[in-house]
Amino acid sequence: MYKRQHALSGIRGEKSLHLCFGNYGGQSIQKGYWKDLMPFLNKLDVDHLVLEFARRGYDELDAFKELRPETKLGVGVVDIKDNEVESADVIAKRIENAVNVLGMERIKWVHPDCGFWMLPRSVADRKMAALVAGRDAYLGR
């Protein structure tokens, strides 16, 4: 823990940290639950956490009610392990679900679960367009 805190101590401005369970290629290679990580997450000196949920599922959102209120969340709403491009409606429903569980004040960002490095560029571009369309649909734009 100390090394992580030390690594973040020199950063000015907003500090974000991405965490996922490493399901490379869609295969879950690490087991665990977000609730088990709450003591660790509550000790981190970060402004917001960037988390995967689209692939993993949203069943554990309740665990984040135990997160320090000043730590905001980035919620993954686009599955980067699948070539299928989500519809705007699917993404809007994922956002709505997260907001219903955690409240709008906790969610700072919606984003893909992780990076798109495994996907063809054309798929990644369409997924990003779907993310924008889903966010806009959720916001009623």
Model-found features: residue ranges?
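Domain-level signal for soluble alpha/beta catalytic cores
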Residues: K3-R141
